Every structure is written in structure tokens, then in C-alpha cells.
């Protein structure tokens, strides 16, 4: 019995214990952590009783017990507080650098940033700084790209400041508007050459060909002036997003409206006027295309009837000419008879006078 117990004890693996070297490293790292936190503004949080939720991974059948256990909170130990505040110092320094960059490089956002920081709670400081920093970075990048590639746009914006034509859009909105127009132009491409549609009709042994070059060229001219329905909607939605409208991704309805001043300014802008003119030309072009399509369909469906209609028209014209000729001859005959009667009456009167004399 004693031998079996001794063999079992020998076969058991020894417990893994950390080496002294690792313990020394952990001690010095903890010492650095506590010293940095003590000499930072985070020392205040070391003496606050902060709670932390306990993560419960046990699977119990009773749901009420699970919810109660998941909602339980415990106080952090002093060591956990030191570690938590030490790692929070890194994020604090990053956000502090973002704040300095926002206030110096993106100085036009300084007023909004400070006002938001004063009004908001301290728990929202990092989110506010990140939003202002990312927004300022986008604005600065858009301005730089426009300055390098499309400097006349920037000159126009500064030139119209303080006037009725002032563009109140942000630099990112102007950037999206300018470069999205170029993308749309590249997608549209150049105009297509006019095509001639010849249709042969076989009726009564004769054939006729009709060319639709003029109709196709006129419809292409209208298409060149106007944009398609989808392009017009895309341009209008893009302009609304640029001035501050927000749309729901699922339903497509408007979820946020801009201020009334911005909407009034947009209604007075040249872009809104161009869109309205484009919608008018779009309707005219679509109506012209529908008419041309209907004419082509009628010609294709009623080919043999065209010749019959032409023949009937010619017969009617010939009959009208015959009737007019008959009427003209009757009028001429009446004139001749009237002239002969008048001349005979004059002769009879002269004969009577001569007899009297």
C-alpha cells in the first residue's frame, strides 16, 4: 500500500510556479505604474470607489438567477485601479494631442470644441474631441486637395463670401460635389452618332423606305441637354445630403433636416435652379422620345396601310380638282351666255333706233 501511494505521488506533475525573474519584472512594472499614476492627474481616480461588472460564464437553467448574477458589480482592488488608470493615461495623452492639433491646425473648430466641452459631461470628452479632430482632418484634407487640383473653386468661394451667392457648404461638401460631378461626366461619356432606321413595306407589289435621322438627332440633342431620371434623383439627393439632410438607410425617408436658413440659401442657389431646369428639359426629352417611339411603332405596325392612305389621298385630290374644273367651266359658260345676251340686246336697240329715224 505504501509503495502504490508513493508511485502515484511521483507520477503527479509539479505545480507550475512563476520564476523569480518574472516576479521581479512584475514588481518593477507595477512600481512604474503606480508612480506614473501618482504623479498624474489620474491620482484622483485611485481614491474613488469604482465598480466593475462580474462576467458570469456559468450556464444555469434559471433565467432570473442568470440576470441577477450578470447585473452584479464588485469594487475594483487597488492594484486593478492602478493598472486601469495607467492604461487610460495613454488614451488621455492621445486625445490631448488631438485637442491641441484641433485647436492649432483646425482653428476654425476651436469655438465649437470648447463650447461642447463646457456643456457636456466629462465622460463624453473623448468622443467630442475625436469627432472634432476627425471632422477637422477631413475638412483640412478636402481644402488641400481642392487647392492643388481645383484652386478656382476656392477662389470663387472666398470671392462670394458676404454676398448673396455665398456658398455656406463645408469644404468636404464642396469636395464631394466637385469630384462627384466629374465622375458622373465620365460615366455619361460622349454623344452617340445618329442612326438611320429604314423600314421596307410590302403592299400591292410596292416598297417604301423611311429614314428617321432627324428624329434620332433631335432626341439625342435633348438627351445631351438633359440628364436621365436616375441621374437627376442622384444629383438632387447628393445636394440635399451636402446641405445637411440625413436619410434612413433602410426606408430612405428623411431622418434629419438642416436649419431653415440653409434650406432657403440652397433654394436661392444656382445649383437648385440648374436642377429645376434639368427636370424641365428631362420631361421634354422624355415626351419627345415617347412621340418618336410611338411614330416608329405606328410605322412598323401600319406599313401596308400607309400606301392605301396615300392612294386614297391622291384620289380625293383628283376628285377635288375635277370638281373645281367643272365649277370653273360652268362659271365660264354662264359668263359667255350673259355676254351674248347683252350684246344681242344692244343690237336690237340700235335697230329700233335706226327704223325710227
Curated annotation (Swiss-Prot):
Keywords: Coiled coil, Membrane, Transmembrane, Transmembrane helix. The keyword Ribonucleoprotein does not apply. It is found in: Membrane. Residues 184-229, 283-357 are annotated as: Disordered. GO terms for cellular component: endoplasmic reticulum; lipid droplet; membrane. Residues 305-337 form a coiled coil. Residues 346-357 have a biased composition (Basic residues). Residues 305-314, 322-337 have a biased composition (Basic and acidic residues). The chain crosses the membrane at residues 21-41, 86-106, 135-155. Residues 195-223 have a biased composition (Low complexity). It is a multi-pass membrane protein. This is Putative uncharacterized transmembrane protein DDB_G0291600.
